[in-house]
């Protein structure tokens, strides 16, 4: 008789296949700081230039606790989600609006987006992070991070995203 073994592959540095890496338990903070567009153009406050950071803490179970801190977005848009793909050792995250908005507010807010990502192995990865609107189209203009990271179980890896870039509105 023929016996087949099928395995689920996690995104790892030893695996060159597309995996079933996924994000889940996405939550958005309330608006942390609000600035009107007029105020921002007249006199940008130092806090509005605060760098957006992505933190990834890899658990022993392969689940990563992630946070994008201080994402700039329109005040009318309350929910952002995160998509992930992984091929070989490249992880691509896309932070985007959950739904399309017809009416936008004349202000921007800073939000945090928390999510979990699984299953990951310890190791070195090439990470790309994009921002997108609700249509989820993105290119190099929306690339806010492109670099190498090392994930170690039980440790937080933090990267700084390109500053001053709000999520696009489509």
What is the predicted function of each stretch?
Residues 1-6:
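Sec-dependent N-terminal signal peptides
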Residues 8-10:
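C-terminal motif of bacterial Sec signal peptides marking the signal peptidase cleavage site
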Residues 12-170:
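Exposed, flexible binding/inhibitory loops of compact, secreted disulfide-stabilized domains
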């Amino acid at each position: 008789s023929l016996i087949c073994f099928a395995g689920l592959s996690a995104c790892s540095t030893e695996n060159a296949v597309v995996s079933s890496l996924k994000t889940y338990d996405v939550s958005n903070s309330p608006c942390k700081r609000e600035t009107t567009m007029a105020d921002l153009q007249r006199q940008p406050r130092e806090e509005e230039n605060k760098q957006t950071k992505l933190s990834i803490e890899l658990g022993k179970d392969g689940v990563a606790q992630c946070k994008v801190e201080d994402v700039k977005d329109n005040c009318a848009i309350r929910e952002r989600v995160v998509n992930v793909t992984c091929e070989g050792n490249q992880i691509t995250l896309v932070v985007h609006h959950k739904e399309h908005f017809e009416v936008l507010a004349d202000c921007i807010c800073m939000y945090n987006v928390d999510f979990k990502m699984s299953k990951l192995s310890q190791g070195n990865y090439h990470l790309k992070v994009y921002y997108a609107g609700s249509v989820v189209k993105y290119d190099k203009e929306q690339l806010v991070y492109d670099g190498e990271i090392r994930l170690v179980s039980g440790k937080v890896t933090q990267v700084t995203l390109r500053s001053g870039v709000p999520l696009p509105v489509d």
